[in-house]
């Protein structure tokens, strides 16, 4: 196997772990971390293909994805803090109680 295959296998494993975590966990912070893991798996794929093809387009795209992910993390954690202050729990099953 060449290097691209190794990177894609690692990326697929990371994405699978993230997907399983999103589907099975009930803690919102753990689900959020699993979503970030899936996002980083996609970033690894972009960088691997960018290096394999010899251009920087994928790496530039990853830079923008990481910028958006940082903003997403800040907003997501602020929402978790507000949810915890309101319900004193971060369980996903309690999130449906915040309906108007």
From Swiss-Prot:
This is NADH-quinone oxidoreductase subunit K. It is a multi-pass membrane protein. Its main location: membrane. One of its GO terms (molecular function) is quinone binding. HAMAP family: NDH1_NuoK (MF_01456). It holds the Pfam family Oxidored_q2. Belongs to the complex I subunit 4L family. It is found in: Cell inner membrane. GO terms for cellular component: NADH dehydrogenase complex; plasma membrane. The chain crosses the membrane at residues 4-24, 29-49, 60-80. PANTHER family: NADH DEHYDROGENASE SUBUNIT 4L-RELATED, NADH-UBIQUINONE OXIDOREDUCTASE SUBUNIT ND4L. The keyword NAD applies. One of its GO terms (biological process) is ATP synthesis coupled electron transport. Keywords: Cell inner membrane, Cell membrane, Membrane, NAD, Quinone, Translocase, Transmembrane, Transmembrane helix, Transport, Ubiquinone. NDH-1 shuttles electrons from NADH, via FMN and iron-sulfur (Fe-S) centers, to quinones in the respiratory chain. The immediate electron acceptor for the enzyme in this species is believed to be ubiquinone. Couples the redox reaction to proton translocation (for every two electrons transferred, four hydrogen ions are translocated across the cytoplasmic membrane), and thus conserves the redox energy in a proton gradient. NDH-1 is composed of 14 different subunits. Subunits NuoA, H, J, K, L, M, N constitute the membrane sector of the complex. The keyword Transmembrane applies. Gene3D superfamilies: 1.10.287.3510. It comes from the Bacteria. InterPro entries: NADH_UbQ_OxRdtase_chain4L/K, NUOK/Mnh_C1-like. It catalyses: a quinone + NADH + 5 H(+)(in) = a quinol + NAD(+) + 4 H(+)(out). The gene is nuoK. Its EC number is 7.1.1.-.
């Amino acid at each position: 196997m060449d290097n691209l295959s190794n990177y894609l296998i690692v990326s697929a494993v990371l994405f699978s772990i993230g997907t399983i975590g999103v589907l099975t966990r009930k803690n919102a912070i753990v689900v959020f971390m699993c979503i970030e893991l899936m996002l980083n798996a996609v970033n690894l794929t972009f960088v691997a293909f960018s290096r394999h093809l010899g251009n920087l387009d994928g790496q530039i795209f990853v830079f923008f994805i990481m910028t958006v992910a940082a903003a997403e993390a800040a907003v997501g954690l602020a929402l978790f803090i507000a949810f915890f202050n309101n319900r004193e729990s971060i369980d996903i099953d309690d999130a449906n109680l915040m309906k108007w």
